[in-house]
Amino acid sequence: MPERVVIALGGNALQQRGQKGTYDEMMENVRKTAKQIAEIIARGYEVVITHGNGPQVGTILLHMDAGQSLHGIPAQPMDVAGAMSQGWIGYMIQQALRNELRKRGIEKEVVTIITQTIVDKKDPAFQNPTKPVGPFYDEKTAKKLAKEKGWVVKEDAGRGWRRVVPSPDPKGHVEAETIRRLVESGIIVIASGGGGVPVIEENGEIKGVEAVIDKDLAGEKLAEEVNADILMILTDVNGAALYYGTEKETWLRNVKVEELEKYYQEGHFKAGSMGPKVLAAIRFIKNGGKRAIIAHLEKAVEALEGKTGTQVTP
């Protein structure tokens, strides 16, 4: 049986630091990423893909902001922006990957699923929004918008004021069974983009909520749902490190899950960057996964072979 791997792509798969985020820039980055993924598929792995969407959702929100202020076009809620980003990014990845596979003589279907992620409406994150989204405003404008739209706004590291939204823990995906069936039939699925569109269940129905779900934690849920053997989280550093950015910096190569959990609880990994990646790796192994990897995007193939990155095992 071929090993099944969920690949969680970081923001650098789409937009590199210093880039503006033009279509051509992003497509070039996606093509490079597609080469890595195609090589993994060529080596016999079954692949499921998930990805981040931070800069792209930011762009969509800016477009809406400009459309509303300049032309009176009604802005759509945050969950709609998340769904739009899944279509946008999924389209680029599935096209680039299909082209790359065909160059190698591999005939495989690639599809994107607009994925909804279930969260608990009683999650404490809803009482304490922390995730900055959208454009920067001056204090006066931010507070005016907060009053008009019911937003929570906070100052963001002295750079201006921004809207903040909750970041609840993912409980699972509405489309989990559909995704699993597609994967079982040999189709390459792109799902849970940007962590998925957050939804809550009320009176037997689901409805979207304005929140942001961490894409690595949602990716871990996806890996459980498709019975993956490996969860590989790709980013712009070579793995997880203790005392990161200090003289005592120590990169973790091969680590047992209990040891990694101890480091996590000691606060070695920053919330909002490496923290969720490490937590996703811990959860995956504790929930029955064989191996979790945190590695640099450009070294995905070597990381899967165990030659680089942080390799987490039971």
Swiss-Prot record:
Any one GO molecular-function label of the UniProt entry: ATP binding
Domain of life: Archaea
One of the Pfam families matching this protein, by short name: AA_kinase
InterPro entries per the UniProt record, alphabetical: AceGlu_kinase-like_sf (IPR036393), Asp/Glu/Uridylate_kinase (IPR001048), Carb_kinase (IPR003964)
GO BP field: arginine deiminase pathway
The keyword ATP-binding appears for this protein: yes
EC number: 2.7.2.2
A GO CC term attached to the entry: cytosol
Keyword vocabulary terms for this entry: ATP-binding, Cytoplasm, Kinase, Nucleotide-binding, Transferase
Subcellular location: Cytoplasm
Catalytic activity line of the entry: hydrogencarbonate + NH4(+) + ATP = carbamoyl phosphate + ADP + H2O + H(+)
Recorded family membership: Belongs to the carbamate kinase family.
Subunit-structure text: Homodimer.
Protein name: Carbamate kinase
Species, as recorded: Pyrococcus horikoshii (strain ATCC 700860 / DSM 12428 / JCM 9974 / NBRC 100139 / OT-3)
